[in-house]
């Protein structure tokens, strides 16, 4: 079962928690659609900033958005101009005053979402897929990952028949619920069609039953801006 399901969803409530954190009654559907719009807007607008995830909280009807990015300077802009413009855009979309936080990702090489995005960008630039995968695996293992697996699928290298290629190094225990496994997906839009990239990164085991464990680990690595 661990090989079939999304490893993030499988571990929710064990060592992972949700990326949208709020409670709602009758307006649940509208708030969920607002979250989806905010995420889509941010990921599209900040494509050059290396955004890994967007955390949305709604304390007292005032949305609080936290952006986890590898290049926070791109988000903030010169003298904080860009972040103010972004805050106004989000406030008009959410129809409420939005507070915005930026958290820097110090080691993008072991962040699954960023690794997947990087490989997808290389595939779009016609870099050989095996070279891109091998380089990502070596970087992740060098920076402390205990295991990594990468899947690339589609018309790889412009082949007539689509196929799936994978590369793995170290341990990636998908069935072990206490395993801290980061998972990311990305799509490369090539001239031959789309290619899918999936990345699993094993960072160690979290022995305690702590849904906030991964967030706490990220907060220890980087100060908020």
Swiss-Prot record:
Signal peptide stretch: none
One GO location term (cellular component): cytosolic small ribosomal subunit
Classification via Pfam families: KH_2, Ribosomal_S3_C
Keyword tags: Ribonucleoprotein, Ribosomal protein, RNA-binding, rRNA-binding
Ranges annotated as spanning the membrane: none
CDD domains (UniProt xref): KH-II_30S_S3
InterPro entries, A to Z: KH_dom, KH_dom-like_a/b, KH_dom_type_2, KH_sf_prok-type, Ribosomal_S3_C_sf, Ribosomal_uS3_bac-typ, Ribosomal_uS3_C, Ribosomal_uS3_CS
Keyword RNA-binding: yes
GO molecular function, a single term: structural constituent of ribosome
Domain KH type-2 span(s) in chain numbering: 38-106
Entry keyword annotation includes Ribonucleoprotein: yes
One GO-annotated biological process of the protein: translation
Highest taxon of source: Bacteria
NCBIfam families named in the record: rpsC_bact
UniProt record similarity statement: Belongs to the universal ribosomal protein uS3 family.
Summary of subunit composition and partner proteins: Part of the 30S ribosomal subunit. Forms a tight complex with proteins S10 and S14.
Function: Binds the lower part of the 30S subunit head. Binds mRNA in the 70S ribosome, positioning it for translation.
The protein's name: Small ribosomal subunit protein uS3
Native species: Acidiphilium cryptum (strain JF-5)
